[in-house]
Amino acid sequence: LPCFALDLSLLVEEALSVQSSGFIEAVDKAMSLLRNEDGRVGNLTIVNRLVKLEPLGEALVIGDLHGDFESLIIILQTSGFVEKMEKTKEATLIFLGDYGDRGDKSAEIYYAILKLKLAFPGQVVLLRGNHEAPKDLLGYPHDLPFQFQNRFGEDWKMAYEKTRALFAYLYNAVFVEDRYLMVHGGVSPEIRSLQDIAQAQENRNEALLEDLLWSDPDENVRGISSSPRGAGKLFGKKVTKEVLGKLNAKILIRGHESSDEGFKIDHDGKVLTLFSRKGSPYFNRYGAYLQLPLSEKFENAQQLIQWIHKF
């Protein structure tokens, strides 16, 4: 059973009022939990920075939040997923990365997702986005330091440095055998096995980490081409199909790109993009999340539309 019953309204209240000491404590606890996660944790099997998930029960998958705390609350309230996690171990909450920057409630988002992880260690997975990347790959604008200054006053630096240290312990990907590969950005033709993804954060693999965190699917590219983002690449349909084939997955689920509808489908239904925040600078009409029965098998992201919730 979880360490404690988590009251959502209390969590929201706490996140909005937490002082730097409470924030730092949550980051420290989460970091020590993540650092020591290895092997079997609930329905998760942890292999370095890869999470293998059993095809049991359901998953709630959330895309980029970028400091939009309101959208996170809407998703958790509407889905009733926290209560579900309390009732059954077979409910897994997966975040696809990009928690901070842009929106002005980055600290609140970090606090809330870390408290969720601490309450349900075997049921919450926090992926790494390009806004949680190593220093030389970090997404722009990186306005987290300014937000922390505003939020925490003179203690902001410690809170910020701890949060930056936490980034290294977030996961590169989630894999559900014969079903899904979930990453923040994209895939690369360099991927030969799950092991490559699991150790992509190690120095010699940084080009692969860059692709996982930064790359985008493109309909007009055959293989790969340079990305207008200045990091990562654009990858074509052929790359998607080859990588999914090598790994034994059917659909790539990722975040990283805004979409007016909150989601989009590419590469003949082999790529689903989720975007879960609203507001500037994207002004998308909808945010979306995915609430998915994991035991069912789908070949194509078109079949997942019935499980996508727009708000």
Where are these regions (language model features)?
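Feature recognizes metal-dependent phosphohydrolase scaffolds
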Residues: 1-311
